[in-house]
């Protein structure tokens, strides 16, 4: 059966490769976006936000996407050694770096022949707002089997911070950089198990933490124009023998990462290394809320301004789910997308207290 459409009926079209990296979606946009001017990838990202954010919304939000959709826009690179520039995006905005998105993008570039492919390994370099992302793709019979990425320098920024969240009390956290700034929170201190059933609770608390931290804590990367904490990473012990710890990362419009989060793994390893709890060249296996795994490694120590950091390596796999053409119909009243419940509000204090009490009870029953 042959199926075609009349291009003249539509205002704009985009072509994408859809994939997931250990459960977390990456929609790779390779055609349809206007050229983004800028001398740096950060400038290109800012131009996208100020001029073409409606296209981001059209591709990330319903009906083409959903609250937890994630995307990667391919652009010409700024640095000559890079194969492609990439700007990561989600339902809430754009990000400077993404580990799972880098793994997904490198995998799909190999499987679609958009880079020169050699076996058993193909090196792909991505130019992101946070810096160059070097990936090594393990290739077998044309298929990307596994990807290792060397991330940008990661470092522990602030240690043993505390913040008062109404209904939860004082919560201790670290701030660590792994491509974006993360607030690292031990979920066991608040008595919430990291499970798929508890994601709504973690999402609401994560957004409360993001708001309060960014209102009260000054943030400044030593070199990059990054001045906010963009993600909250809840972590805890795991019962999975192959994993060292597990996490759930909250970001964007209360999105929950289905993968272990590459930048989050980098941020956590940097914190562990700074505290003397992780040695160089020691595998660190991180489990996601869905049970999928990333393997990380601190490859070497570096200085990031006044901070002692690491160069993290993250390894995982991605899988193609589709090749798509997306159309914008000028007669469609929802042409540029929508998001139900855009502002996830915190529950009332009585509800929060009930949630925490129930979580504590569940935690102690299991423990």
What annotation goes with each model-predicted range?
Residues 182-183:
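Glycine-rich phosphate-binding loop plus the immediately following alpha-helix
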Residues 346-366:
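Basic, helix-initiating cap at the start of DNA-binding domains
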Residues 1-176, 186-345:
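A glycine-rich beta-to-alpha transition motif near the start of alpha/beta enzyme domains, typified by
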Residues 179:
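Glycine-rich ThDP/TPP pyrophosphate-binding loop and its adjacent helix/strand module
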């Amino acid at each position: 059966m042959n199926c075609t459409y009349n291009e003249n009926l539509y205002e704009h079209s985009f072509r994408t490769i859809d994939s997931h990296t250990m459960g977390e979606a990456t929609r790779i946009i390779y055609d349809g976006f206007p050229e983004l001017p800028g001398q740096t990838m950060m400038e290109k990202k800012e131009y996208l936000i100020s001029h073409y954010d409606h296209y981001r919304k059209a591709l990330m939000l319903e009906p083409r996407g959903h609250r937890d959709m994630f995307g990667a826009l391919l652009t010409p690179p700024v640095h000559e050694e890079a194969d492609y520039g990439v700007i990561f995006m989600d339902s809430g905005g754009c990000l400077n770096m993404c580990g799972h998105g880098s793994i997904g993008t490198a995998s799909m570039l190999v499987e679609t022949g958009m880079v020169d492919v050699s076996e058993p390994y193909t090196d792909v370099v991505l130019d992101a707002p946070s810096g160059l992302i070097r990936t090594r793709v393990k290739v077998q019979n044309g298929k990307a089997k596994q990807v290792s990425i060397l991330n940008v320098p990661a470092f522990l920024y602030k240690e043993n911070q505390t913040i008062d969240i109404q209904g939860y009390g004082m919560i201790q956290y670290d701030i660590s950089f792994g491509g974006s700034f993360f607030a690292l929170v031990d979920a066991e201190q608040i008595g919430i198990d990291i499970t798929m059933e508890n994601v709504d609770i973690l999402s609401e608390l994560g957004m409360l933490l993001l708001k309060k931290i960014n209102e009260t804590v000054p943030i400044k990367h030593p070199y990059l124009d990054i001045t906010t904490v963009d993600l909250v990473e809840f972590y805890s012990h795991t019962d999975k023998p192959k994993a060292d710890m597990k996490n759930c990362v909250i970001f964007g419009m209360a999105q929950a990462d289905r993968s272990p989060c590459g930048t989050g793994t980098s941020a956590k390893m940097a914190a562990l290394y700074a505290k003397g709890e992780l040695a160089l060249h020691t595998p660190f296996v991180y489990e996601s809320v869905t049970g999928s795994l990333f393997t990380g490694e601190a490859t070497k120590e570096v200085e990031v301004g006044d901070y002692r950091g690491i160069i993290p390596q993250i390894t995982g796999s991605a899988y193609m789910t589709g090749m798509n053409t997306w159309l914008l119909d000028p007669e469609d009243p929802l042409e540029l997308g929508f998001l139900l419940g855009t502002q996830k509000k915190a529950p009332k204090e009585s509800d929060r207290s009930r949630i925490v009490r129930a979580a504590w009870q569940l935690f102690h029953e299991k423990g």
